[in-house]
Amino acid sequence: LPKYGWELEGRGSGFLSPDFNAYSEPSDDYRSQSVRIPYYFNIAPDRDLMLAMTFMTSRGLTYEGKYRQLIAPKKTAEGEHSIWEVEAKYLFDDKITGLQRWLLDTSIELDITDKTHLSAIYKRISDTNYFTDIARTNSEKTLKSNLKLSFDDPSTNLTAHILTEHEQTVTADPGYQRALETSISKTYRADKKSPIQVDFN
C-alpha cells in the first residue's frame, strides 16, 4: 500500500517506501550510495502503474516504469486472467561507462477465443553487464523470449501449437534461436476403450 497518498474513488495512489542501499564499484575507494523513490498509480481495478527513479552516486539516474493490466477472464478451469505486463528501466548516461543502459521485460497471456490462447514473453538488456552494474545482482544468466499460439478443442480432441523461442545470455556465451516449431495432435476414438492418437510435428 502507498506510504503517502490519497484515495480516488476507492483506489489508492501514492509514494511507496523509498529504498536506500550502499554498494561498491571496482574502482571505488569508498562505498557508493543509491536511493530509489517509487510512486504507485492504482488506475482502475484491472490495471495499475508504478513509476520510480533510482539515483546511484557512481552512475547516475535510472528511470523505471511497470504497467500491469488484466484483459479478460480466462475460459480455463484454473480461473486465471489474461494479463499484459510491461517493465522498462533506462539510464541515459552511465557516468562510468558513458553508455546508455536499459532493460525491457514484457509479457502477455491472452485468450483469443475459448479454444485459442496466445502467450508471449520478450526480455532484453542493453549489455551483458547490466545486472551486475545497474541492478546489482548476478542471479540472471539467460533472458528467454518466446511466442506460443495454442489451440485446444476438447469436443473434437484436437490440439495444436506454434512456438518460437530466442535466448539472450548475460555472459559472453552466444545465445540461441529456436526454429519455428509446429505441432498438431488429434485423437480418434474407434470405441470408448481404444482411443487412437495421431501426431504431426
Where do the PLM segments sit?
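Outer-membrane beta-barrel proteins and related beta-barrel translocases across Gram-negative bacteria
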Residues: 1-201
